[in-house]
Each structure stands twice: as C-alpha cells, then as structure tokens.
C-alpha cells in the first residue's frame, strides 16, 4: 500500500532541515556539489511546498517567489527518483501556480533543466531561450501565462 501524500509547506524546524536536505539530495548531490544549503536572498520571502508521505518522507519539493508585482518564478523543483512519473511534480506545480495567482501574478517563469522540458511543456510552459545555470547543466528559460 502506498503512503498517503500531502502537499504542504514545512512546519517545524526538523521539517525545514529535512526539506533543505532533500533539495540538496535531489538537485545538487547527483552533480557532486558539496552539501551547502540551497538558499538565496529570496528564501525567506518565498513559498515552499513539499510532498510528504504519512511516514514523514519528503518525496517532492518546489519553491515560488515573486520577481515583481506580476511575475512569479518557480525554483528548486525536484521529485525523488523512485517517485517520478506518479504525478507528484504536477501536484507541486499546481500548488505553486495557485499561490502565484493568490499573489496576483499574471505569469510564471522558470529555468528548467533540459531533461525536464517535456514535463514543464505538459504543464503548459513554453520554452523562451537557453539559460546558463551555475551548475553548468543545459537549462531553458520557460514561461506560462496564468488565466
């Protein structure tokens, strides 16, 4: 039987630590990047969501921040390798998009790893231009207009 999965923000200090560790584990460890928390100047002003199982395992995550009054940006999206293609990424994107609408955004941008382009296209995002990431992995800037 599969665990029940809840999409929500981390609540406790312990959950925030697990969330930070998960982001590194999924997004940076495979690139052999040292375990440094993935935090920037927008971290505290951002909206963080995770998919967490009833056994308290984080299996997906994503973050949203506002670039300006009308444009939001998704960053740090990731899904556990053994949980991919189960709809968890879509659930996180839906929650992030709903948050962007609440904040008054008219569009969302993101910089997708090229291996994830088809996923984001399936969510309604359009490729805009190549993006140079600090990870040296090919990325593409994408955008979606909210309705």
Predicted regions and their residues:
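Active-site rim helix/loop that mediates acceptor-substrate recognition in acyltransferases
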Residues: 21-54, 58
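Conserved beta-strand in the GNAT
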Residues: 50, 57-65, 73-78
């Amino acid at each position: 039987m599969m665990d029940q999965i809840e999409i929500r923000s981390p609540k406790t200090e312990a959950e925030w630590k697990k969330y930070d560790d998960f982001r590194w584990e999924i997004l940076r460890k495979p690139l052999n990047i040292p375990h440094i928390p993935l935090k920037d100047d927008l971290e505290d002003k951002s909206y963080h969501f995770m998919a967490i199982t009833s056994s308290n395992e984080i299996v997906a995550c994503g973050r949203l921040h506002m670039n300006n009054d009308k444009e939001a940006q998704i960053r740090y999206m990731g899904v556990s390798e053994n949980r991919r293609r189960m709809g968890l990424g879509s659930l996180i994107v839906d929650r992030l998009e709903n948050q962007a609408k609440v904040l008054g955004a008219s569009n969302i941008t993101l910089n997708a790893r090229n291996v994830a382009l088809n996923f984001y296209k399936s969510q309604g995002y359009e490729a805009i231009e190549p993006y140079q990431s600090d990870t040296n992995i090919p990325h593409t800037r994408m955008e979606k207009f909210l309705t």
